[in-house]
Amino acid sequence: MLNPMSTETYTPTALNFPSLNFDLGETADMLRRTVAGFAQSRIAPMAAEVDRKNAFPNELWPEMGKLGLLGMTVAPEFGGSGMGYIEHIIAMEEVSRASASIGLSYGAFSNLCVNQINLNGTEAQKKK
């Protein structure tokens, strides 16, 4: 199993326990690999410094947006990815695996903010 303090590269197979294989499908597996690669290459190297400075690295937002991680549960007609909560949790797991604090910020933005507008906003708010 991967030691979180280790410098070795994370691959989804590092946590491949047969009893935990939920067979979520190829899309979920591809999403996990993509987000894991991004999180380990971009987020993990800055995680300790982010915690020391107590600041979110704003340059990550556009990068996460390009990956489709912002607005995952929002319908495509409103600019989202149109995915479900399982996919959102997979993204949360991988971002949080690289940095718990960045994962928390991402979760607050993507679920507490964007998702609430998606669920409860007016048509105009959703389009904005």
For each feature predicted by the language model, list its residue ranges.
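Intrinsic disorder at enzyme termini
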Residues: 1-27
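Glycine-rich flavin
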Residues: 30, 37, 42-128
